Amino acid sequence: MEDVRLLKQIPIFRDFRTTELLSVNMVAKSKVYKPGELIVKEKAKGDGLYIIKRGLVKVVKQDSFGEEHILAYLGEGEYFGEISLVDKAPRSESVIAEEESECLIIKQVDFQNLIAGNRELERKFYKSFARVLCERLRVTNENLTFSKEINRLIQEVEKK
């Protein structure tokens, strides 16, 4: 039941009933990662959603010079890889355990098989997924606008 409560916190599952979350939980598996262990590798094929049950992970991206940049730290109740429930595109970042961490993993193939047999569950998932993507797009647009404004101000200062 603890994992069901964890699933309920994830935006794409927020509208699911308890019985539906129990179905999702049936296809989920827990895995423990040691500090420094690679959880997902940048450019590897996306294969599922990872929800952090406990611990701390870091999200890193390599630049064109091979330098690793930390983009974020994620802890208990946070998640990554949700887009791979729909799309098997390569991972955009690597995720590494900072400390011993346990993740609840929902593989794409298992999740797709689950919702394929249940139209209502499929509808709820894609509606929630679209809402999450729209929220992210809004934030990205705001960040892009802010970044353009900062660049404009820098150019003005450099002219003086």
Regions found by a protein language model. Give the residues of each.
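Cytosolic regulatory regions built on CNB/CRP/Popeye-like sensor folds
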Residues: 1-160
